[in-house]
């Protein structure tokens, strides 16, 4: 699925200063390698971006993965006019090898928030490739698997709230039990939960529990029939095409404020034999066991 724009790719490195993490641990500086996909200006052969300000999506990959696995999905968003910044989590990305640890997941919401800060700083600069590119009032976050746990904490846990975020897509994620705050003690921003019903890694109860715990009016659950943990987000297949269309319509609705995009969500999310989209707490989405 391709949008109107051709896309560019630029790799950046941000250094998150030393700070106290949400559990009170002292954290040293964290290096955040970041791949930024962005819409290119029409009529130019170089790397010049389309005219801003544009909406921003910050994306968190799953444990021991990097954004390359999700390239088609991220490119779909960028080709539709979004700047998409995908972080390499410093202690759990594909680059960490045997040193990767899920214990650092509690610190990853801070990495996502620092990505937002860093991208906005580049946009505020007077010069540079991304100067003036990003609209600070149009920011979404998304993540898959452990990256989904990460963005779910920003949206719904008292530990990690970031009020700059307008919408959150949790792709086969869960409530990470070691987060220091409380989940869903307040109404979060609009959230979309996507889940394969044949997923044995992040089992359906993990996403269903969040959908049911969320009390916001704008909440959605995309049920993918027979999909496993990664197929809906990697490469191009019938599941990935549904996820690409529904997530894009979700961002268009709640980041850009385009009301007709909700109809597009329902049209693209209800595909006989492939997917069903439920909303506002409705649908046969049963809470269940979640093992993380």
Regions found by a protein language model. Give the residues of each.
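Alpha/beta-hydrolase active-site loop
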Residues: 69, 101-136, 153
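Gly/Ala-rich beta-loop-alpha elbow adjacent to hydrolase catalytic centers
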Residues: 143-147, 151
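Residue in the alpha/beta-hydrolase core beta-strand immediately N-terminal to the catalytic nucleophile
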Residues: 128, 138-140, 167-169
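Alpha/beta-hydrolase-fold serine-hydrolase catalytic core, especially in secreted/extracellular enzymes
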Residues: 226, 235-292
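Short conserved active-site loop signatures built around small residues
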Residues: 1-58, 83
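Short substrate-entry loop that stabilizes the transition state in hydrolases
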Residues: 43-97, 178, 200-203
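The feature captures the conserved acid-bearing segment of alpha/beta-hydrolase catalytic domains
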Residues: 163-229
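Conserved hydrolase catalytic core segment
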Residues: 154-165
């Amino acid at each position: 699925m391709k949008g109107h724009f051709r896309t560019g790719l630029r790799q950046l490195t941000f250094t998150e200063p030393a700070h106290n993490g949400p559990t009170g641990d002292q954290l040293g500086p964290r290096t955040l390698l970041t791949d930024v996909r962005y819409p290119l200006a029409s009529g130019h052969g170089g790397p010049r971006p389309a005219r801003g300000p544009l909406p921003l999506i910050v994306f968190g990959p799953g444990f021991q993965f990097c954004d390359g696995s999700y390239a088609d999905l991220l490119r779909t968003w960028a080709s539709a006019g979004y700047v998409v910044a995908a972080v390499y989590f410093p202690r759990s990305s594909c680059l960490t090898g045997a040193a990767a640890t899920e214990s650092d997941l509690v610190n990853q919401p801070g990495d996502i928030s620092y990505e937002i800060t860093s991208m906005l700083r580049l946009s505020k600069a007077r010069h540079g490739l991304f100067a003036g590119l990003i609209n600070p009032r149009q920011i979404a976050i998304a993540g898959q698997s452990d990256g989904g746990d990460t963005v779910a904490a920003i949206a719904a846990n008292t530990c990690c709230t970031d009020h700059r975020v307008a919408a959150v897509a949790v792709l086969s994620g869960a409530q990470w039990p070691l987060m220091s705050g409380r989940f869903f003690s307040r109404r979060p921003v609009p959230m979309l939960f996507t889940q394969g019903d044949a997923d044995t890694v992040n089992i359906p109860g993990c996403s269903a529990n969040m959908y049911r715990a969320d009390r916001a009016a704008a909440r959605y659950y995309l049920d993918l029939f027979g999909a496993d943990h990664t197929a809906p987000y990697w490469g191009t297949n019938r599941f990935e095409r549904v996820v690409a269309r529904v997530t894009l319509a979700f961002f268009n609705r709640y980041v850009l404020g385009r009301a007709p995009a909700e109809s597009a969500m329902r049209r693209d999310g209800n595909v006989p034999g492939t997917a069903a989209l439920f909303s506002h707490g409705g649908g046969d989405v049963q809470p269940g066991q979640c093992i993380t």
